[in-house]
Amino acid sequence: SGLSLRVFGVLLTSFFENVTLNRSGSAINRKFDFSSLKDLGVTFYENESSIILDGKLNAGTVNINKLDSSQILTGLLITLPFLNDNSIIKCKDLVSKPYIDITLSLLDDLGIQIKNNNYKEFVVEGNQELKRNKVIVEGDWSSAAFHLVGAAISGSITINGLNLKSLQGDKEILSVLKKCGAELKIKNNSVTVIKN
């Protein structure tokens, strides 16, 4: 997936000086822009079948622009705390803030501290270590939304394992369904939608 290529692409450059990511399927036609990594010592090339990242990722200051996608930022937020020095990520026109909130929340749960200056700058201390190594992965609101909408149109469904306090933006499907007249029953981490 695009997320995997972007996040793992960044992560792998912290371990290896030369990384080649082979792409197939829909990834062949997608744009992948790793050019912001040049600020941290990594150059980027791509052709139809591969993304090539040359150079080992260094700590430092990096500028992320809107074209880079929030997924590159996610990769940097996950990777930079483990490098030897401190880093600063400067962002312009950040997209997909809920996904960044999810990343920051997960890292915080694991004991990784990152200072968020209103999504314009992230200050990352280097040499951090995980305080925990177990995570409970919450249900995916994006995937659940399709089924919840289908039930609102044609019947009923109950989906378990959805975190009602989730930072996932697609959790908003509940308010949309309510406005559309669907009957909702919410109990613990269980959501039932009934056609009304």
Predicted regions located by residue number:
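Short, structured segments at the rim of ligand-binding sites
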Residues: S1-N196
